[in-house]
Each structure stands twice: as C-alpha cells, then as structure tokens.
Amino acid sequence: MAKDTTGRLHVTVKTGGKRKLSSKLWLERQLNDPYVAQAKRDGWRSRASFKLIEMDDKHRFLKPGMTVVDLGAAPGGWSQVAAKRVGAAEGKGRVIAIDLLEMPEIVGVTFARLDFLDDSAPDKLLAMMDGAADVVLSDMAANTTGHRKTDQLRIVGLVESAAAFTSDVLRPGGTFIAKVFQSGADAGLLVQLKRDFQTVRHVKPAASRQDSSERYVMATGFRGGRRDKC
C-alpha cells in the first residue's frame, strides 16, 4: 500500500491467475473509493446514495409527505435515501421502487417488479400510488456495447423513455431527475424536457467520479402531462 496525494493509503491489487486488467482496475477503484467505504459504514446499499443526498441537500426536492418513484431502483441506494427524506417508514410519504430485478426489502419502500417501458406500466403504478408522484428518479444506465456513439444513443433513448413515462405519472409542479452522460446526443431530450418542465439544468455531484462523463439532468416545475391535457 502507498499514500496518494491526499495522504490516504492507496491499495494496489496484484494481477494474478485469471484476473483481467480491467477487473484489477475496477477492484482497485472500489477499494480506494472513500464513498464506497462510507456507504458501508452508514448502511447505504451503494455509493450512489451520496449522489442523491448531495443533490437533495442543495436543491431540496425531497420533502416529508411526498410520493417518490425510483426507476431502475436495484440495489436500492436511492430508494433508501428517498424513504428517509420523505418519512416513508413513519407513514408520512411513499416510495415506489421499480425494477426488473428483484431487490431486498427496504423499510418504507414498496417494490414493484415491473417494466416501465410496458404500455400498461403507468396505469399499474398510478393504481399502486392512488394518485400521481411528486418526484420521479432514475439512476439507470443502458447496457453498453463498447461503441461510443451507439452507447450514447442507447443512454439517451433510455432517459427519453423514462421522461415519457414520467409525463404520465408525475403531478404538475413535480420533479424528474435522471442520469445522463455528457455528449452531443441529448439535444432532443433537452427539447422534450424544456417543453414539459419550467426549469432544466445539469448537475454533477461530488460523489460522481471525476473521470466519468456521468452527470444528472434535473427538471423541475412539471407543466402537466398528457393525462392532464385530455
């Protein structure tokens, strides 16, 4: 082990056996990531929890009594934070976590194994919530192919689908937050969001790795969706 420029001990993983270089680098990054260690100490399911904590500390979009939908929720780091902030465990607010993968139970969170891309998904969700959501969150990322342009289009397409779903389940004045990656492929997405929301901005929490193009689009002040205009 050696110290890095911050004075912290840096763990180096030896390459041996069948371990690939990519696996070695990923393991080293995890072992030396302070957010990974802090998440374990604080009981969060993933380091991603700190991204939502930081964004909400600054912008205050999660409030007691709100109803929150977490798309692609597994393993549940964002659902944990949302449940705590809206008071779901005390019955003040509600958090609905949606994913195709099973997810261990979280106190105060209702889990739905559901494909949000299915045409019937908005109606099923609205029936579960008995009303519209105040906030829709998405920390999803599309499966990558290794081809940069293809991956960018896949990621933007996923967020566009999440935004379309949101327009069916979000109440006027609500908030939509989704993970995106910095590229020139999201122009259409921004046009869509600026049409449907009063304010649209990009944010990059400190917990997002600095060498990553990851950032979040935050859309606030929902103008009302297709259901409201029928």
Curated annotation (Swiss-Prot):
This is Ribosomal RNA large subunit methyltransferase E. GO terms for cellular component: cytoplasm. Its EC number is 2.1.1.166. The keyword Phosphoprotein does not apply. It catalyses: uridine(2552) in 23S rRNA + S-adenosyl-L-methionine = 2'-O-methyluridine(2552) in 23S rRNA + S-adenosyl-L-homocysteine + H(+). The active site is at 179 (proton acceptor). The keyword Metal-binding does not apply. It is an enzyme of class 2 (transferase). S-adenosyl-L-methionine binds at residues 76, 78, 99, 115, 139. Gene3D superfamilies: Vaccinia Virus protein VP39. InterPro entries: RNA_methyltr_RlmE, RNA_MeTrfase_FtsJ_dom, rRNA-MeTfrase_E, SAM-dependent_MTases_sf. It is found in: Cytoplasm. Keywords: Cytoplasm, Methyltransferase, rRNA processing, S-adenosyl-L-methionine, Transferase. One of its GO terms (molecular function) is rRNA (uridine-2'-O-)-methyltransferase activity. Specifically methylates the uridine in position 2552 of 23S rRNA at the 2'-O position of the ribose in the fully assembled 50S ribosomal subunit. Pfam families: FtsJ. It comes from Nitrobacter winogradskyi (strain ATCC 25391 / DSM 10237 / CIP 104748 / NCIMB 11846 / Nb-255). It comes from the Bacteria. The lineage of its organism: Bacteria, Pseudomonadati, Pseudomonadota, Alphaproteobacteria, Hyphomicrobiales. SUPFAM superfamilies: S-adenosyl-L-methionine-dependent methyltransferases. Belongs to the class I-like SAM-binding methyltransferase superfamily. RNA methyltransferase RlmE family.
